Amino acid sequence: SPHAFRLNPMEDSIQEVIQATLELSANGELLQFEDVFANHSIHYDITHPYKQLLIKSKSRVKVYSCPPDSHSPIMRRSQIPLMWMPWQRQMMLPYLLPPELPETQLRQLTDLAMSFVKRNDSHLIDSLMDINKKIYEDFSYVQGITFLETTAFDVFSIRKGVCQDFANLFICLCRLIDIPARYRVGYIYTGGDYENKL
């Protein structure tokens, strides 16, 4: 069975990877590559039957000081709209498509997304931070009022939901201003058989 792993931390001007290891309990064929987003990636094809697959990833990184609100001089200023080479756009297309919603709802959400871009002088990071701040400040965390079928527009309208709803709204707004975004689900195993280890 084939598997894809993207577990290595990114290395850039504010983070250095000292060591990164990946241990897999089942034998298979391993191919390492860098994907279009510059992620260190591993394709692992397990060719023999197995009863259990244990994945152990360990990383040690050195993080250099950079205040979270200071995007320069280390981080270059990126402007919206972002410019993509045709092959990059092709690779990112699944992460650029907005959700299937009525046109009137998409227009409202697009207007909202563009309001952040305009008020931040088209600065990429500042616009994204502003969207995040707005969701954090203006939306209430309320369990049990949304479902898997709840759309980004529904969340925008009721201003309530849970983490997944806020993430989906953020992703939708990003895509409407041509910033690739996706939702990933994962977990961290912390060991032990007692509750609330995290």
Listing of model-derived features with the role each one plays in the protein:
Residues 1-82:
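Intrinsically disordered, low-complexity N-terminal segments that are enriched in acidic
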Residues 7-9, 24-26, 39, 48, ...:
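Generic structural "secondary-structure junction" signal
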Residues 11-13, 28-30, 50-52, 67, ...:
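A generic structural micro-environment signature
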Residues 33-37, 65-70, 157-160, 171-183:
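Short, surface-exposed, charge-dense and proline/glycine-enriched linear segments
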Residues 44, 95, 139-141, 166, ...:
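Aromatic side chains
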Residues 76-161, 169-171, 176-177:
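Secondary-structure boundary elements
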Residues 133, 165-198:
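Hydrophobic/aromatic-rich core segments of domains that either
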